[in-house]
A protein has these predicted regions:
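N-terminal structured subdomain of primase-like DNA metabolism proteins
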Residues: 1-98
Length: 98
């Protein structure tokens, strides 16, 4: 399994993979309430969260953790960085994201 990725690949995964889309494809518990994206934090299990669409980050206000798509995938799938990037690359290839 390749361990090196281009800067462009990593930038695209962090910035172009929509976090609501990713939550849906991971089958991760989430919903919208009053315009706010509420999700179960993969670190602490709480649902005090929101999405910053300009930065493509989600934040858990309980454990004070920010997640980009790669970080969220690592936490949700309990995998390392390389596995998470490979998973996201395969997912985006199948859905023609890039």
């Amino acid at each position: 399994m390749a361990r090196r990725f281009t800067d462009q690949q990593l930038w695209q995964l962090r910035n172009e993979v929509s976090l609501p889309w990713l939550l849906q494809h991971l089958g991760w518990p989430h919903r919208r309430r009053d315009g706010q994206l509420i999700f179960v934090c993969p670190r602490c299990g709480e649902s005090r969260s929101d999405l910053n669409p300009q930065e493509n980050l989600v934040r858990c206000f309980h454990c004070q953790t920010n997640f980009n798509p790669i970080d969220f995938t690592m936490a949700a799938r309990d995998c390392d960085f390389v596995e998470a990037v490979h998973y996201l690359l395969s997912l985006t290839d199948r859905h023609h994201i890039r």
